[in-house]
């Protein structure tokens, strides 16, 4: 059974400029969650709970999105807004997320090669 997947999310997103000048294209919202979350949710549903993400400079928002935000959760605890985090909290609890940075943007093949250590056998 395949239990690992790799998301190459290091690109510049130039086709979405100017929106991607300050926000990674993978974090652009589709309805109420970022694009990358849809792919991760599908992978986890398919049994691939070890998710490797190959990121680039300026992509810290992706790593932050798949990590617990204790300050935010504490701030909204007990309020009606707490339910908004339910979906991503479930994803975070079910998955294991590992990031590696692609130092040079040399294309998709290079991004996948950069992520090879995250996937292994």
For each of these PLM feature ranges, what is it?
Residues 18-21:
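Conserved catalytic-core motifs of eukaryotic protein kinase domains, centered on the activation segment
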Residues 1-7, 15, 29, 33-121:
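Conserved N-terminal catalytic core of the sugar/cofactor nucleotidyltransferase
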Residues 12, 23, 58:
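A generic "binding-loop/recognition-motif" signal
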Residues 26:
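Active-site mouth loops of central-metabolism enzymes
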